[in-house]
Amino acid sequence: NQQDGFSSQLRIDSRGGLSVSITYDDARALAIKNNLTGYKGLPPGIAKNLTRGKPLPPGIAKKAVPSIMLSQLPHYDGYEWQIVGNDLVLIAITTSIIASVINNVFD
C-alpha cells in the first residue's frame, strides 16, 4: 500500500497471522501534520503488556484515532487503529488481539 507518500505493508504468515508495517517516521509525520502530539505514555508496567500477538490488556484506555489522521493510515479489513497512551496500535476488532504497536507516535 502507498497512500499520501507513506509506505505500509500487510503480510500474512504461514499460520494466517497478520503482520502490519508502517514506519514510525511515517506515523509520527502524520501525528505532527495533524497536531496530534503531547499525549502521555503508559506507565512502564502497563506498557510492557502492550504486545503484538496478545490481546489488549483489560482496563487499558484507548482512544479512536481522529478521522483526519485515520483517513491517511492504511486500512485493513477487520482491524482498527487506536491510540493507547502515546502509541499507535492496530487491533483486531472481533478479538482485541494486537496486530501492531508503533511506540511514541503521539509523544
Predicted regions and their residues:
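Low-complexity segments
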Residues: 3-107
